[in-house]
């Protein structure tokens, strides 16, 4: 695995289900005041950064749990490969079939100075919400660089039939 210049690599899980004869995927919306009014093109698969010498699938599972509050069962994963985001960050993803109540998802938190230069430190959720989307909806919501994961998921499911 090669990383960007800063060595940043993320690993994540694209959870999917069939609902009402349609394929749906679970996407996450980043938390914090800088993301409040951002929607189309600003959602992501639940993912997080890899620390040195960590096993990538373990990172993907851990980050999924941290960002959704949901422990992924020991279910088979389908490798979706990697993409590179505009920032240069490398993102690796796996797909898992599963279901969860998106309304009960709870993310871990982070702290930052807010408002900027105020001297006040506030706590924000890393992910402020997760939602299920059809593939067509997800293509509009997801960061453009991550859309190929949807195509790869669709191809993997079709090949498995």
What is each residue range found by the language model?
Residues 122-128:
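Non-DNA-binding regulatory cores of transcription-related proteins
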Residues 135-161:
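Charged phosphate-binding loop/patch that engages nucleotide di/tri-phosphates or the phosphate backbone
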Residues 82-119, 131, 153, 160:
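Active-site-adjacent beta-strand/loop module that shapes the phosphate/pyrophosphate-binding cleft
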Residues 44-80, 134:
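The catalytic Nudix box helix
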Residues 2-44, 94:
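N-terminal strand-loop-strand
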Residues 28, 80-82:
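Residue-level detector of high-confidence beta-strand sites
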Residues 50, 72, 100, 105, ...:
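Hydrophobic pocket-lining residues within nucleotide cofactor-binding pockets
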Residues 19-22, 32-35, 51-52, 87-89, ...:
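Short, charged/polar surface micro-motifs in flexible loops or helix N-caps
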């Amino acid at each position: 695995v090669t990383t960007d210049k800063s060595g940043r690599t993320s690993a994540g899980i694209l959870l999917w289900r069939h609902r009402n004869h349609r394929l749906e995927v679970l996407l996450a919306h980043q938390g914090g005041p800088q993301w409040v009014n951002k929607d189309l093109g600003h959602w992501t698969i639940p993912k997080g950064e890899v620390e040195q010498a960590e096993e990538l699938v373990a990172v993907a599972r851990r980050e999924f749990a941290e960002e959704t509050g949901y422990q992924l069962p020991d279910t088979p994963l389908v490798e979706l490969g990697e993409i590179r985001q505009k920032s240069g960050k490398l993102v690796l993803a796996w797909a898992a079939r599963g279901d969860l109540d998106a309304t009960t998802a709870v993310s871990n938190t982070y702290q930052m100075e807010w408002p900027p230069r105020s001297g006040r430190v506030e706590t924000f959720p890393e992910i402020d919400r997760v939602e299920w989307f059809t593939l067509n909806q997800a293509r509009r919501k997801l960061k453009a660089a991550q859309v190929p994961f949807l195509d790869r998921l669709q191809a993997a499911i079709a090949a498995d039939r």
